[in-house]
Design a protein with these regions (language model features):
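Catalytic core of carbohydrate-active enzymes
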Residues: 75, 379, 383-401, 407-418, ...
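Extracellular structured ligand-interaction cores
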Residues: 82-86, 96-98, 106, 129, ...
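A conserved hydrophobic secondary-structure block that centers on an alpha-helix together
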Residues: 77-78, 154-157, 167-215, 219-221
């Protein structure tokens, strides 16, 4: 059951698609406080949700703020990342209630989940006007399913988007891109996408191409597609200020940009320098901006990634001027003391980026109402995704277009996926990736993944392999790095190359199961990844597991995420069949009873556990998704006590939007 409660006159967010009448009665489970809401937690209560946030699967023990932020340093002390996902799913503990809470609010929401008082959960919206949805059901899976129905079907990408994406900030020429494709082919590594960062643009301006470095983008796109790969370019939120640029000129002429208090366009700097920012909260601006993608779809481009759309702000001219004046004053002093150096020099420079005062200095038009940006800040990136998603439905009707974004809000999951932002090449970030996935998908973002190997810092060969051994299970599987870091395309690691090749081929072999699991989750509002406690709520050990995930109906994964480890502890809430896999053709199996186990897992091995009565269809590996043959399959299985195992498999053309036809489903059974 879903109950809706309205307080004041909340601003629209378009997060919800299901019409729920407003309830007049008291809000169940929660206690109203002066500045928000509270819930008393039992000692064994668990709090899931909040999507893209730091720390573990259980969010208890920290405080958080949903405030979409260009956060380059991912660590446990952070309060916010790139997405605002205001859904909590509370497992009250033994003998207590389970319920979901969705806070539909476009600005900051502050959460204290056992941080101040370990038994107290509190949350408060920055303004009093908001809506609450309280969801109750039979169990955690049922509540999750109801929430997904409330917010609408998750975005479904083309099937080729489940292949490997190779990306880097630093592919500076068309020849760089060709060399990546050539090396993947020569090293017999499967590949489906090469993602281009802002290097391909002219002066870092959206919807432009540098003709000297990329003389014929359409030809490059066609050349790669003939080899089984797609080009996937980046688009940023800020529009470079250049009167000669048609996008800038059009946007100014039709009043498409966010404005300052005096009605003039708001200006801040990002990669191209000074930029304007489209007012994506207006339907006509979304339609206008979405049309601009045609310049690239006409070149044969079938996939995009949207970035810098929190929006990230490097500086505003006003704030930069004030900083320079402050530095000029300091430069005339003979001695700069500690407080001045760290406060004015270091703090002043760092304070230029994403300054709260800048976010409070420009405005949107929301249904004819002038609204200051910081009040609706979390809607911005999601509405850029919406602009693109709606445009692709017009530009490529009946066809699927790949789209994923950095910033998001619940609701934008209907238009595109997300990646988990600018992580780092550390083992801690691998664990963070594992722990973030179920909560992000709980909030509707099914097409999700992290930058494999890590985006910043220099990766190591063993981290590249171990991260791939988890990444081969995630819907978005992209290797991405920043300019200046170690080159980390998989063919670069000569000593690990045989193992990396086998793991990439394993991903493609498992696509019949992974794609079917994704489509089931999208079409039936079930989960792709979920914590063990969802299926085993009465098992206290299962509820506390933070580093194993259930994958669809029949599989559990337990990645190794510590350096130099040759195995790991695994908890099995029921008997399962272990597949210790070195390649599609080289693995050993063992039926393990329920309980605690130490399981050996060499650096070139991955652990896959199949639940009783379930089967996993396995294809022969392929060089790209287009070459995958799903007509001849092997079943990896864990037969039940009757000796049978089954799976539901989904097959379609992977390109069109005809999702619901019943003939796409078939049951494979082993007796």
């Amino acid at each position: 059951m879903i109950q809706r409660f309205r307080f004041g006159l909340p601003l629209p967010t378009d997060s919800v698609v299901q019409e729920i009448p407003v309830s007049a009665g008291p809000v169940p489970f929660l206690t109203a406080e002066e500045d928000g809401w509270a819930y008393r937690m039992a000692p064994d209560a668990i709090v899931y949700g909040l999507g893209e946030m730091p720390r573990g699967i259980n969010k208890r023990g920290w405080h958080y703020v949903t405030n979409n932020t260009d956060e380059a340093r991912h660590s446990e002390d952070k309060l916010s990342y790139y997405g605002a996902h205001n859904f909590l799913l509370i497992d009250g503990g033994a003998g207590r209630e389970c319920f979901g809470v969705f806070i539909d609010f476009p600005g900051k929401v502050r959460y204290d989940i056992g941080y101040t008082e370990y038994d107290a959960l509190r949350f408060a919206t920055e303004e009093p006007d908001h809506e609450l949805y309280i969801i109750t059901g039979d169990d955690l899976n049922d509540i999750s399913r109801q929430f997904r129905q409330l917010i609408g079907r998750s975005y479904i990408p083309p099937k080729w988007a489940f292949g490997l994406a190779q990306s880097r900030f630093g592919y500076k020429t068309a020849e760089d891109v060709r060399e990546v494709a050539r090396q993947y082919k020569e090293n017999d590594l499967p590949l489906d996408m090469i993602c281009m960062d802002i290097d391909y643009m002219q002066d870092y301006a959206d919807f432009t191409v540098n003709k000297q470095r990329f003389p014929d983008l359409a030809d490059l796109s066609a050349e790669l597609k003939a080899q089984g790969s797609r080009l996937v370019p980046i688009i940023d939120a800020g529009v470079r200020i250049d009167p000669k640029n048609p996008v800038c000129a059009e946007g100014l002429a039709n009043g498409s940009f966010c404005t300052k208090a005096d009605g003039t366009p708001f200006v801040a700097a990002v990669w191209p320098g000074k930029a304007y920012f489209p007012d994506f909260l207006r339907p006509e601006v979304r339609e206008w901006f979405g049309r601009q993608y045609k310049a690239l779809t006409d070149c044969g481009i079938e996939g995009f990634w949207n970035d810098m759309n929190e929006p990230a702000l490097f500086y505003s001219p006003e704030r930069l001027k004030a900083f320079f004046e402050s530095m000029d004053e300091l430069s005339r002093k003979d001695n700069i003391v500690q407080d001045e150096f760290f406060g004015k020099v270091v703090g002043g420079a760092l304070g230029l980026m994403n300054a709260p005062a800048d976010y409070a200095s420009f405005y949107h038009d929301v249904d004819g109402q002038r609204v200051r940006h910081d009040r609706v800040h979390n809607l911005y990136g999601g509405n850029m995704t919406r602009a693109a998603g709606e445009a692709f439905a017009r530009l490529r009707p009946g066809r699927r277009t790949l789209l994923y974004s950095r910033s998001s809000f619940i609701g934008s999951h209907r238009y595109g996926g997300i990646w988990l932002g600018d992580n780092a090449s550390t083992w801690a970030q691998l664990l963070a990736n594992i722990q973030m996935m179920p909560n992000v998908q709980l909030c509707g973002f099914l097409y999700t993944g992290a930058d494999l190997c890590g985006f910043s810092y220099d990766t190591t060969p063993d981290l590249a392999l171990r991260w791939l051994e988890f990444g081969l299970f995630t819907p978005l599987m992209r290797n991405h790095a920043t300019d200046g870091s170690r080159m980390q395309e998989y063919y670069r690691f000569a000593d690990m190359l045989p193992a990396l090749r086998k793991m990439l081929r394993l991903r493609y072999a498992l696509l019949p199961y992974l794609y079917s699991t994704f489509m089931k989750a999208a079409l039936e509002n079930t989960s792709y990844f979920r914590p063990l406690g969802f299926d085993f709520p009465a098992d206290p050990d299962a509820r506390e597991v933070q580093d194993q995930l259930l994958l669809g109906e029949g599989v559990m994964v337990a990645p190794v995420y510590t350096q130099n480890a040759s195995g790991r502890h695994v908890y099995l809430p029921e008997a399962m069949k272990l597949y210790r896999i070195r390649s599609v053709d080289d693995y050993d199996t063992e039926l393990l009873p329920a309980g605690h186990h130490y399981v050996r897992c060499a650096l070139d091995e991955v652990l896959l556990f199949i639940r009783p009565g379930h089967a996993v269809p396995v294809a022969r590996p392929a060089s790209c998704t287009a070459q995958l043959d799903e007509t001849s399959l092997t079943l990896w299985a864990c037969p039940d006590e009757n000796g049978s195992a089954r799976c539901r498999m989904y097959t379609d053309d992977g390109e069109t939007s005809d999702f619901a036809a019943p003939e796409h489903w078939k049951v494979l059974e082993l007796n």
